[in-house]
Amino acid sequence: MTVIDAPRTLDPVTLEVIRNALPAISDEMSFDLQRTSYNMMIYEVRDYCTALLDTQGRLISQNIGGVSHFVADLGVVIKDGIQRFGLDGFAPGDVILHNHQAVAGQHLNNMVCYTPFFHDGELLGFAVVRAHWVDIGGQSTGFGAGGTAYDPWSEGLQIDQLKIYEAGVVDRKLLKLIRDNIRYPDAAMGDLRSQMAACRLGERRFTELVERYGRDTVLRSIDTIYRETEQKCRGVVAEIPDGVYSAESFLDAASGRYDIKVKVTISGSDMEIDLSGCSPQREGGMNSRTFAGAHIAYKALTVPLEPVNEGSFAGLRVVIPEGNMMMARYPVMMASWSGALPTVVDTVWRALADALPQRIPAAHSGSLGATFVFFGYDPRRDRRFVVQSIESGGWGGRPTEDGESVSMSVCQGDVRNAPIENIELKNPILVLERALRQDSGGPGKFRGGLGINTRAQALVPGRWAAGGGGGRVNCPPWGLWGGQPGKIAETLIKGPADAEFRRSESPRYIGDAGSEVIHRTAGGGGWGDPLERDPARVLVDVQEGYISAQSALDDYGVVLTPDLARVDLEATAKLRAHRSILRR
């Protein structure tokens, strides 16, 4: 795409039509992918994004609800492809695959498929789909090889900017190589065809837009949209008091503790997020190469309700040195690449809590969800199977309202858990419980949202991936302004002959038929003093089962009648006054 430096007058009506048409193209790509994909992680969980990028690797548009941490650095892959092939090295009919960690910086399941689009022989940009493949080979299946991997090659098949179609001609040998090295080739090839179809649709729709309004008008509109988006974001940042703000937290994993230290600098309309204080890379899968955590925190703070494009991040500078856990040097394992991102976002917001006390929420569950994975061989159907889902947690209380319960991480867009009926229909597994986790939300004037309990039983022997908290099992979602932390996540396992559940310390567990796993996701932190919560809201929480009567008494100082029908206002006032005195 030609860079247009000098803005010329655009018809404002046409500009608005194009402004809305671009994300509509990405949305249509998304709908096409969702309807035609083979694996549940795409068509049910929606673990993907669809996007258009220009010939500089800048983001033109993404689908509404696309996985945030997929899109935030998608341009890195396209820029690498441009450097590899040159702008003259792309032809109509090309289809390129890429998941190599040295560039993509994620676990290998997140496969990027992209195609170039042209008008009158000129390359104008790329249609891109990044989607979670159910398997990519390696030592294990599921969400990457997890705790069983010992180097990046044991995590799976690395594909580095390979053209599986060149000028419309398929490379069948390359496709066979991919099929022969993954466990579920039919699903993977079906998903690949879905990704290709979505990209082709994006090509057609963008070309139609150019044919209707003209090349120059569309390209100038895109540049204008970039500039206007940047200006809106900068306008919000300019309202934050200048200064240097810092905060820290941590993650825990089998490979040890990871420090998350953040420094945010505000200078006028510029924001810098410095992650230099985070732990260095190390063995273990919680490494990545991504700016996504910083980008997501910035987008949510500025114009969260508007479509994202390259201008959304133009006012942000991110500092991450090479060798940092967020900018790990290849070769290094990245199976749990995204585990740190929600905590990075929370910690950036925590740093700004003093500057924006009426905007910043308490910490959310801080995890990408308990990894509900079970895989093996189903003798009843004579096939291998894998069950993958994501269990959501609680969001932090806000300055004016409670946190949302059982919601996905801020990093995950519209990702959702898989329906139980579909899980059980297609796999030898029985889901015995999926329910709100009582008392998991942090007490506060505005309570943290609740996590969820999910209990599942194997109907055949297999392997569980029992990763419960995404690295936040010892770092509870913190409260703000007197709010209390939410409960941490945990995973419990039980064999068919065991009388009781026991805590799982391993990310993998070999289970016989009848074995069970319970995932308990974290709740969000509370916002404000729990003793200031309206007693009537505490009563409703007890009656709805969100909190116990004991929590009402112990955490909120609210005395209920024995039948839990009313608040004893006199006893409540006395108890709260007494506790306030004890705090002095």
Q: Predicted regions: what is each one?
A:
Residues 95:
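Glycine-rich phosphate-binding loop of nucleotide-binding enzymes
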